[in-house]
C-alpha cells in the first residue's frame, strides 16, 4: 500500500487545515516516508501536526523544481528534520522568476539553504533504491501549457525563458505497482507520463500531481480545447489519475467530463492506493 496525504495544496478538505497556492505531499511506502515538495512556507508543518504526520521521521525529500510554491518551506523543514536526504536538480538553485504583466518577480529557492551532504543533485535518471526513481529532462511532442511562457530564469545577468531543466518527477515502485508523482508538469503531463513509461517499462498504474492548466498570477485557465486534448491523451495512457494544485478546479471538472479516471487531492485528504 502507498498512502498519500496532501499536507499543503491550494484547497482544503476542512477549515482546520490551512491552504495556500503550493504543494506538499506526504507519501508513505513500505520502506520510506517521503515528502514530495515543501509548499511556499511553513504551513505544511502546521497541517502535518494536525494530521498526525511526524516531520522528524521523514527520510526522503524530493523537490520537484525550483519554484517557491514547491520549495519555500525548505528552511522550516531543515529546522524540523535532521535525517532526510533531499533530492533536487542542480538547476533548482538557479534564479527563477515569474513575470506578472511583464514585470519579473523572484520566485525561486533560497539557495543559501542548499548546503551539506544531505542535499543530493540528481541526474536525468537517478535510481535511489528499489522503491524510488527520479527522472528529468523530459521532451516530447505534446504541446506545452501556455502558462509556461510567464516563467523565466536569470543566466549571465539576463532573464531568459525557463527551459525547466530544474524539474524532476518521482516514480515509486512497490509490490509490482508504479506510481508517478509530478509537481507542476511544466514539461507537459502527457510527455512526463510517456517518459515515465520509458524509464520503468510501462505506463504507471497511478499518476499524481499538478498538470499546470491554471496560471495563478493572471487567474486564467488554458483554453478548453487544450484541456480536453490533454484529458483525451491521458485517457489513451490507461491509468488512474489524481490531480491538485496548478490544475485548478475548473480544469479538473472539464477533464472529468471527458471520462478520465480522475480524483482531486485537497489539503488533509488521505488517499490509500493498492490496498
Over which residues does each language-model region extend?
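Glycine-rich phosphate-binding "P-loop"
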Residues: 1-15, 148-161, 212-222
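Conserved beta-strand hairpin/beta-sheet module of binuclear metal-dependent hydrolase folds
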Residues: 2-51, 163, 167-181
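Divalent metal-coordination and catalytic microenvironments
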Residues: 27, 37, 48, 65, ...
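Structural motif
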Residues: 32-34, 60, 132, 178-179, ...
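Short beta->alpha connector loops
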Residues: 39-42, 67-68, 186-188
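Active-site metal-binding motif and surrounding structural segment of the metallo-beta-lactamase
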Residues: 43-94, 198-206
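Cap/insert and terminal regions of metallo-dependent hydrolase folds
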Residues: 70, 163-169, 173-267
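Metallo-beta-lactamase
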Residues: 92-168, 255, 263-274
Amino acid at each position: 500500500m502507498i498512502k498519500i496525504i496532501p499536507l499543503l495544496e491550494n484547497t482544503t478538505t476542512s477549515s482546520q487545515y490551512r491552504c495556500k497556492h503550493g504543494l506538499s505531499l506526504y507519501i508513505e511506502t513500505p520502506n520510506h516516508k517521503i515528502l514530495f515538495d515543501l509548499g511556499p512556507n511553513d504551513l505544511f508543518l502546521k497541517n502535518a501536526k494536525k494530521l498526525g504526520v511526524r516531520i522528524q521521521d521523514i527520510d526522503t525529500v524530493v523537490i520537484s523544481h525550483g519554484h517557491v510554491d514547491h520549495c519555500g518551506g525548505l528552511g522550516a523543514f531543515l529546522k524540523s528534520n535532521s535525517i532526510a536526504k533531499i533530492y533536487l536538480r542542480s538547476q533548482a538553485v538557479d534564479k527563477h522568476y515569474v513575470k506578472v504583466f511583464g514585470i519579473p518577480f523572484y520566485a525561486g529557492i533560497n539557495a543559501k539553504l542548499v548546503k551539506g551532504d544531505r542535499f543530493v543533485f540528481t541526474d536525468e535518471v537517478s535510481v535511489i533504491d528499489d522503491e524510488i526513481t527520479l527522472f528529468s529532462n523530459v521532451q516530447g511532442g505534446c504541446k506545452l501549457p501556455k502558462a509556461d511562457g510567464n516563467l523565466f530564469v536569470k543566466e549571465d545577468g539576463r532573464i531568459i525563458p525557463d527551459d525547466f531543466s530544474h524539474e524532476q518527477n518521482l516514480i515509486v515502485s512497490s509490490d509490482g505497482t508504479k506510481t508517478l508523482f509530478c509537481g507542476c508538469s511544466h514539461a507537459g503531463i502527457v510527455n512526463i507520463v510517456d517518459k515515465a513509461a520509458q524509464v520503468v517499462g510501462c505506463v504507471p498504474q497511478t499518476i499524481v500531481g499538478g498538470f499546470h492548466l491554471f496560471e495563478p498570477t493572471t487567474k486564467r485557465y488554458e483554453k478548453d480545447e487544450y484541456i480536453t486534448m490533454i484529458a483525451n491523451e491521458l485517457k489513451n495512457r490507461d491509468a488512474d489519475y489524481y490531480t491538485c494544485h496548478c490544475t485548478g478546479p475548473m480544469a479538473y471538472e472539464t477533464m472529468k467530463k471527458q471520462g478520465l479516471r480522475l480524483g482531486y487531492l485537497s489539503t488533509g485528504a488521505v488517499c490509500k492506493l493498492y490496498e
